[in-house]
Amino acid sequence: VEQLIVVAFAFECPECQHGDFYYMPSPNVVASSDYGPIIVNAHDTVVGRNILRTGSWEKNELGLMIKLLEILFKKNERLIAYDVGANIGIHSLALAQYFGTHIKIRAFEAQRPLYHMLCGTLALNNILSVTAYHKAISDRTGDTITITLPDYNLPNNFGGFEVVPPRLSDNQSMIQSHSEVVETMALDNFDEAVDFIKMDIEGMEDQALRGAYRLFEKYLPIVFIEILKTDRDFVLDFFKSRRYRGFQAGGNLLALPHNFPVPVQGLNALF
């Protein structure tokens, strides 16, 4: 059963007498999820639809992430996680609710409307442990990319939006709306002992890793990274050269540091 609260915004009508308003329906709704209320686009055909129908998204993957972080939490008093390609924030919300004040999360989203929804969800749940960034994570900081956003009032897989053309696109039929500029950021901007990185940025994963060389020289975070659209060979070699162990997790690579203390069962080893 889909559970949602439809939200409508009131705007003052310039042609009406003072005090009159007209209402413009929004495609966004506040939905119940396993982790608290979350703002979703009712036209979203993948993430939003699954949350509306089941209360979650990638529940098995989220469960795996939590188990891995629980292992790290046994030796760390506070965890640091990056949600790269946060979309509307279901992963950040789940991890923040589960670990509470024991985790600090940086969530990055390039699509401004999704970033706004992410921020709204954080406010609805009074979550202070997540800092959200309207940035496209890439190999450099301070560059700008002009992107043509999809039409959020029509059905589509908004999480599949591609900031730059990837090696393998599955989204050429997306109906476009208007163009705007987003600034890039490299993960090397942050010099902190990050424990976990979830990365799903529709083909820009290789560029994001190129902007994180210093990070991986100093720290060895667990990485859960999508490899469907990106330069797969580069990504695999990146982790192999750093003595990571790699496992297939659906369309994702789970990369564990060589010193991770617990063996992995139930996933196919890639290296």
What are these regions (language model features)?
Residues 1-271:
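Phosphate/nucleotide-binding beta-alpha loop and adjacent structural elements of enzyme active sites
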